[in-house]
Amino acid sequence: MPLLDSFTVDHTRMNAPAVRVAKTMQTPKGDTITVFDLRFTMPNKDILSERGIHTLEHLYAGFMRNHLNGSQVEIIDISPMGCRTGFYMSLIGAPTEQQVAQAWLAAMQDVLKVESQEQIPELNEYQCGTAAMHSLEEAKAIAKNVIAAGISVNRNDELALPESMLNELKVH
């Protein structure tokens, strides 16, 4: 099985909250697609609550689009990581980590302005697979933590696992 890009970086050395360019690729027509690792918590140290990350998923995608989309950038998708330490964001374009961090902070400020569960988009059984699993309070706590900590940048060259370690860790 091929090794996925996200598993070639040392999760024990990641900062959080932090932005990392996880992957960049070109479409056949020449457009740039960039995948960002938006790490909210330190891997293997903390996880986002299931209700908080789910509510954030509903709010964050829209708020990030409001702050980052433009003539050079269009967000394709923002999805929570299975490990519940952050989100992956795929987009057309190549914004800088600083632009993404600024949009992320602005989106967290927007989360704090949501006044009630009724203002959470698509929170109903027709548009959400687990409509009962939400907590605006927990989403706001996550947002407050990000704002208080600030957002740094994780760089692949600083986090790369050595080839010898990748071979040692390989599943046989």
From Swiss-Prot:
Pfam families: LuxS. Fe cation binds at H54, H58, C128. It catalyses: S-(5-deoxy-D-ribos-5-yl)-L-homocysteine = (S)-4,5-dihydroxypentane-2,3-dione + L-homocysteine. It comes from the Bacteria. Keywords: Autoinducer synthesis, Iron, Lyase, Metal-binding, Quorum sensing. One of its GO terms (cellular component) is cytosol. This is S-ribosylhomocysteine lyase.
